[in-house]
């Protein structure tokens, strides 16, 4: 049986070790599961003979907390965890979240804001010369100068502010092994400048071969046009086969150099990574706190792929995992599934089989495997490329094998299917079997919007494509003798979304006959195409000016429009309708979103506090004919 890696000096000594080779400092609790980057990288290093100790969620107010194992022989590895620490801590409205799913019992406050910078500087206070290598999503997406939504300014590469030596960006397996081997052979960390998938600092470019010179930090900080140009160059250099080395100048601090991305893992390498001896659970020290909430959903889920060629503008996957699909073999996935069914708390349900996009099981075309993805076009947007290979046969076969396993009652597909890719496949077997076997009443899909203008900036297919998918899904349900529904995810206030487009989305929600309980407001996270548009007002790939709903108030209005039935949103909805010139939607008709203010009740305070006033003995009972309520329409 696998045992957890050391988290204390006693754990280290119990193994007979005097010193660890690497100390992995993470902002997450320690969960030894393949869905956690800390587990993957530390287990991979262990498999190559390196001794790794884990310091999960150290107290950043005490420098002693970073010295649990003393000085490591080779270096410190630092990650904020599975999520960016700022996204983990704050909503898009910049309000503190109440729960941290990656901490014991969901407790908030066990990691600092900007965890990578804080941890790295904490290490430097005690271990001034020990190599520090950054990794994980927070460091990866801040590897060059970037717009920071929380401070509303352009910030340095995280390498500058952290005082670290290297960034291992992306998924990191190839680069971390190469870094470890270099350090182990005695190469100084300052000379490890050749590893693909890394970022390093240097004083000049004398040892950098034909770099692409990006606009300097001072330029991108001062000029939004320069920022957009820089982003476009970086966006077009995310493929390991075609990317160049990029250099960004920081004045007296020298240069930050980004090497091309590491090659994607082969299927054999993917299998090896997921076959490492993970315990599959959180460390027992968290038992008293109720465990780690993030594990609950993924404990009985299976990762089948990495990478995504969907290229949604608001998604960071292009910068982090890349566009080239990497998959595990059926044998590897089935082996994990069988092991899963033997867990004492397995109830017969596999919660998900997928990855960034569940139904991607092969590269979009064969060219990707040898020449990389196209720099000047996308695989699915604005419509599927003529060279796209849309084929679900392998995924269908995998799902069938999983369904046939003993002890398995049902296999769900919850990580999302790309509906335009489903439609591009002329064989309807997958859609038919998805409806029949892998959905439980509702299929969650992500059209994101209904306005083709907004969808263009999102990098999503037109609304007509989504409507066609709904018809095909309905046919598949009828064929299976089931009544199931597609539940759409929508996003408000994305760049390009004017108030008129927001009202159009509200009308669509009205016609669906349901009110979304949760609305995803666009969140400008580092290194996405949409965030570049948000900050600059420019589409970096076309130079086109883009309307951006930026103020907190306008974002609140667009969000409220999607939940127009909620009485507390009435004033915001009314304001949005006025701005859009759509006062025809205020009235008593079935197409209206809100009712007019009642005569005799003064100003809008009555409606803002409608619920309270109805209960007041001083208020007359409301007439049924003018309730701020819409009858839920029956699903067709």
Which ranges hold each PLM region?
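Conserved SAM/AdoMet-binding glycine-rich loop
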Residues: 24, 55, 59-60, 339-487, ...
């Amino acid at each position: 049986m696998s045992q957890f890696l050391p988290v204390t000096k006693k754990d280290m000594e119990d193994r007979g070790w005097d010193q660890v080779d690497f100390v992995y400092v993470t902002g997450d609790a320690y969960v030894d599961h393949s869905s956690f980057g800390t587990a993957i990288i530390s287990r991979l290093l262990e498999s190559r003979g390196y001794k790794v100790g884990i310091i999960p969620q150290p107290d950043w107010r005490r420098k002693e907390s970073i010295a649990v194992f003393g000085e490591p022989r080779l270096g410190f590895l630092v990650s904020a965890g599975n999520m960016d620490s700022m996204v983990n801590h704050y909503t898009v409205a910049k309000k503190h979240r109440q729960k941290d799913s990656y901490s014991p019992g969901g407790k908030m406050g066990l990691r600092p804001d900007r965890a990578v910078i804080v941890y790295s500087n904490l290490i430097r206070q005690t271990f001034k010369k020990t190599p520090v290598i950054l990794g994980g999503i927070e460091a990866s997406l801040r590897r060059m100068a970037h717009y920071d939504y929380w401070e509303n300014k352009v910030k340095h590469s995280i390498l500058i502010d952290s005082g670290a030596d290297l960034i291992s960006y992306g998924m990191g397996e190839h680069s971390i092994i190469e870094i470890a081997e270099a350090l182990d052979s005695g190469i100084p960390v300052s000379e490890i400048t050749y590893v693909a998938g890394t970022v390093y600092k240097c004083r000049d470019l004398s040892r950098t071969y034909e770099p692409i010179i990006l606009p300097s930090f001072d330029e991108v900080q001062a000029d939004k046009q320069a920022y957009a140009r820089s982003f476009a160059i970086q966006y077009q250099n995310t493929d390991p086969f075609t990317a160049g080395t990029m250099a960004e100048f920081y004045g007296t601090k020298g240069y930050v150099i980004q090497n091309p991305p590491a090659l994607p893992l082969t299927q054999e390498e993917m299998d090896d990574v997921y076959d490492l001896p993970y315990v599959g659970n959180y460390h027992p020290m968290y038992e008293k706190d109720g465990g780690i909430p993030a594990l609950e959903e993924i404990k009985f889920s299976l990762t089948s792929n990495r990478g995504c060629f969907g290229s949604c503008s608001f998604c960071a996957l292009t910068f982090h995992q890349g566009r080239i699909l990497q998959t595990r073999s059926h044998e590897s996935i089935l082996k994990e599934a069988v092991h899963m069914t033997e867990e004492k708390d397995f109830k017969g349900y596999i919660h998900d089989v997928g990855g960034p996009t569940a139904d991607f099981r092969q590269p979009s075309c064969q060219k990707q495997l040898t020449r990389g993805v196209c720099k000047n076009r996308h695989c699915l947007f604005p419509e599927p490329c003529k060279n796209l290979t849309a084929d679900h046969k392998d995924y269908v076969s995998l799902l069938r094998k999983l369904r046939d396993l003993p002890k398995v009652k049902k296999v769900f597909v919850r990580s999302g299917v790309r509906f335009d890719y489903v439609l591009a496949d002329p064989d309807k077997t997958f859609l038919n079997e998805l409806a029949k076997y892998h959905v439980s009443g509702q299929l969650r899909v992500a059209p994101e919007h209904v306005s083709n203008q907004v969808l263009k900036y999102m990098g999503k297919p037109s609304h007509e494509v989504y409507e066609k998918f709904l018809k095909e899904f309905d046919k598949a349900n009828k064929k299976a003798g089931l009544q199931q529904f597609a539940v759409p995810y929508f996003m408000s206030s994305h760049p390009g979304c004017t108030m008129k487009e927001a009202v159009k989305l509200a009308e669509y929600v009205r016609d669906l006959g349901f009110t979304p309980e949760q609305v995803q407001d666009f969140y400008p996270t580092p290194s996405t195409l949409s965030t570049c548009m948000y900050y600059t007002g420019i589409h970096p790939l076309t130079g086109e000016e883009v309307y951006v709903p930026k103020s907190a108030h306008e974002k609140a209005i667009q969000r409220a429009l999607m939940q127009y039935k909620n009485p507390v949103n009435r004033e915001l909805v009314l304001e949005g309708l006025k701005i859009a010139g759509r006062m025809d939607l205020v009235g008593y008709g079935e197409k209206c979103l809100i009712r007019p203010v009642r005569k005799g009740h003064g100003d809008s305070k009555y409606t803002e506090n409608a619920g309270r006033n109805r209960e007041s003995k001083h208020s007359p009972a409301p007439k049924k004919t003018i309730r701020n309520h819409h009858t839920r329409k029956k699903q067709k």
